[in-house]
Each structure stands twice: as C-alpha cells, then as structure tokens.
Amino acid sequence: MIIKNSEFIISAVRPSQYPVDNRVEMAFVGRSNAGKSSLINVITNRRKLAKTSSTPGKTRQINFFLINNEFYFVDLPGYGFAKVSKSEQQKWGSMMEQYLINRHQLKKIVLLVDSRHKPSKEDVQMYEWIKYYGYETIIVATKSDKLRKNDFQKNRKIIKETLNIRDEDKFMFFSSLNKSGKEELLEILSEGIFEEDTME
C-alpha cells in the first residue's frame, strides 16, 4: 500500500461525533507512550499528522485520520497511565470500549507494545479482549531501534508467549526512528481490507 494523502478529520469523545461514511477503519491501541502517534506519522509520511508528546496520556480522544480518501486510521487513547485519576482512566476505557464493540467498520486492530519490555498486565488484557470480539490483530513491537541485535529473538519469544499470540495474528518489530518495519506494516494493513465490503 502506498499512502498518497492523509487528513485529520476529527477528535471524538462520543459515538455521535464519529464519521458516518462507513469507510473501513483500522485502529491503533496500546499503553500510553507506546508510540501510536509516532507510528501513524511515519507510515503516513506526515511528521505532525498525529500529535506526539513526551508526556504519556496525550491522546485523550479518539482521533480519526482519512487515508487516501478511502479508509480511516483511528488513534485510540492510551491505557495504563498511572498518573491520572481513576475516574479519568475509567472514562478513557469506556470511550475505547464503546468504539471497539459497536464499530462494524472496524476491520483490523494494531496492538502496540514496547519491544524492550515484557508486555504488561494491561497489554495482555487488551489482547484477550480484542480476540474475544474476533478482530484481526497485528502486534507491533515498537522502539526496536533500542534493541541490541541479539535481543530480537529473545524479546520476540517473551512477547509472543506473554500475550499468547494466536497463530492467525501477525507479529512484527517497528521503529519510528529508523522506520524499520514501515513497509511490512503497510503491506499487512492493506491485505484484504476491501474484500468483505466488495462481497457484500
């Protein structure tokens, strides 16, 4: 897939604000500061399309980006950020759940985890939740530029075993800094995204 144009559409906090044009959507989810916004900027070739911050929890709404005037990338609020109130965490969780459960346009979910660390309890819960609802899942281990060469195999094993990744799901390393994994991810995202709609 070649991304020729990308456009920020809306930051939504409730379903009434979601786009209503029924285009295919692919969501990006992960812990706060997992690198979702940076990843979106890299694969769209736009340095500032998605707002990035060194402060975890910057994304507090559901951000929709129209890609090639054909489908949406959806940047979801990060989870597991300890420095916000319980009520804020619950509000973010409810917002994400409301979107993920009821959005029939949603075809794929990209789950981002930090390649340097064992997935957290929240990462495991998120993966299990995604699989419970039957979504096609791509696990992207970010910040791979921080790994030593001999860390890749070991960390891949730890991540896949901790999450108990299903055989049908894809796993890959990615770096927003050196852009490794960019083409592979774009190829995976493009696989069959319009086939179901064509059949209907």
Curated annotation (Swiss-Prot):
Full protein name: Probable GTP-binding protein EngB
Species per Swiss-Prot/TrEMBL record: Clostridium novyi (strain NT)
EngB-type G domain ranges (all copies): 22-195
Pfam short name (any one): MMR_HSR1
Gene3D superfamilies associated with the record: P-loop containing nucleotide triphosphate hydrolases (3.40.50.300)
Keywords assigned by UniProt, alphabetized: Cell cycle, Cell division, GTP-binding, Magnesium, Metal-binding, Nucleotide-binding, Septation
GO CC terms: cytosol
Binding site for Mg(2+): S37, T59
PANTHER family tied to this protein: ENGB-TYPE G DOMAIN-CONTAINING PROTEIN, MSS1/TRME-RELATED GTP-BINDING PROTEIN
Ribonucleoprotein found in the keyword field: no
Function of the protein: Necessary for normal cell division and for the maintenance of normal septation.
